[in-house]
Amino acid sequence: MLSLVLLLGIRIWMVNRGIESPEVVQFEMGEEAEIGRNIFNDRVENMNGYSVTAESARIMTYEDYLKKYGYNEEEDGVLFEEDNMLRPEMIYEVDILVKNHNKEDNTGCGISYSDYKLTASDFMLSVSSPLYWIANDIAEENQNLMMSFRLRPESEMRFHLPFYFAPGSPAESVSEETVRDADLQLVLSLYPEQRQIRIDETE
């Protein structure tokens, strides 16, 4: 039995030895981060020519977030039932400016926020799709686009990314204090370079 465990350990070590960690390219808020030919998971991804600048960030309650964008659940519809595990309690909103520097249109080139995370050493926060649609005024018929888009050549657009967490949730509990104290990174790509922006509250 011990020999099997030892052999398994050696096998895992040999496999991992051949995996190179991506080079981390660090940006700060206010810096324009060009994505280049880097990707998240799929070689068919094409974000070349696009750049992202994190302009501002803030933490607020779910209720304050809805109030900010004029959404009334009694009139406009309930977004999350009380027992929904994805119901946010707190929002870490990051405002970004996206630019397309390409001079010609390319239908295969664009950005998807489905892979965007705010990452720390021991937790990560995801974008809430319903809150993203509200903040960015996405029409209902376009909400199946899964937060993917492309910009016209040589154009730019601002977006609000609502990363959510729920301190009171037994499943995904992370405290507000933990989030505020963490070294948070907005990851823009994973391979071959991990390009990321350090996020700090500005308000």
Predicted feature residues:
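Conserved functional micro-motifs across diverse proteins
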Residues: M1-E203
